[in-house]
Each structure stands twice: as structure tokens, then as C-alpha cells.
Amino acid sequence: VTIRPADAADLPAFFAYLDDHLRDNGRDGAPLFQPPPVPTMRTHSPLPPGLRIAFIKGLDIPVGEPGWRRLWLALDARGSIAGHVDVRARPEPSARHRAMLGMGVHRAYRRRGLGMQLVDTAIAWARGEESLKWIDLEVLSENHPAVALYLRAGFTMTARIEDMLEIDGVSHDLSYMRYALR
């Protein structure tokens, strides 16, 4: 598997991969890793149009400006996407020294260390960005494999909000984690 930065030409394949990845959300023994866009509807595309636009526009925005985003893809020997990690601007205007991390690994490549490689790639890049001091993330507290991965990568737990989300009538806690770059 090779990890490389993505560009605009990669986005159609990335969106197809991400749509498929999000369909695994809480299914067939996979942990629930994010709330579905409509909590009771899992049959339509789980990839909201606004997210597509955020990726398309964000890749061209300079780091430090509102809406910036960087994306890396893990490609297998056939060139298929095996996983991804993105680092993006926080929405708060006074938090330009912080970034948010999101990631995912295709079902066929989980539990092989690829998640750690992706997180390490994002951290290494962020360390090279002088304006960034922190990487933040949000994770459903019950997603124990993801929480364990982030802790092994050096993230620390900053908060856990009980009953933050209600999905299909079930309460879920949300954990907030951070990584100090400096």
C-alpha cells in the first residue's frame, strides 16, 4: 500500500470509495463511526453533497484560510483506494492554529496497521505547518478500535460528552481528542 497526497483528479474515485466506506457505518459488526446524515435513513448515499463541495474547494485553499483541507489516499497494488486521512480547518475563526482530522480504512484493509500509517502521515505533514499547533478529532466513544488507534498515535482524550447523539433511538457518547504538534 502506498500513501500519497490527493489532488482534484483523485476526487471522483475518492467520493465513490467514501460513499462505500460510509455504508459500513454500524453494519455487519462494524462499529458506528459517525452519525448518518439522516439518523433513520441508511439506504441513500451517506455522502452529503456539502461534503463533496468541501473537498473540491478545500484542496485549493491555502492552509490557515477558512475552509482549507488536505487529503491523503492509501492505494493498493491495483491503484484502488484502501484508506484515507484528511486534515482540515476548524470552523471557528479564532482556531486557525488547530486542525481537524478525519480518516477511514476500507473494510478489506482494516486491522493491518494502515490506520496508524495514515494518522502518522497526517501528523508528519501537520508538524511541517508552522501555523498549526494542535490536531483535534471527534470519535464516537463506543468505537473502541478507533479510540485505541488514536491513543496509540499520541492523541489524548480531552472530553467525553454523554448522550451527545441519538441515532435510531439509541444514545451515543462522543469523545474529543487532541494531538499537540509543538
For every predicted segment, state its role.
Residues 19-28, 32-97, 102-108, 180-182:
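Acetyl-CoA-dependent GNAT
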Residues 134-139, 151, 156-172:
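Conserved catalytic-core motifs of GNAT/GCN5-like acyltransferases
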Residues 170-182:
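Terminal substrate-recognition subdomain of acyl/acetyltransferases
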Residues 6, 103-105, 139:
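Hydrophobic adenine-recognition pocket in adenosine-nucleotide-binding enzymes
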Residues 105, 111-125, 147-152:
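Conserved acetyl-CoA-binding loop-helix of GNAT-fold acetyltransferases
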Residues 2-16, 22-29:
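A short beta-loop-alpha structural element at the N-terminal edge
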Residues 119, 126-138:
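Conserved GNAT acetyl-CoA-binding A-motif
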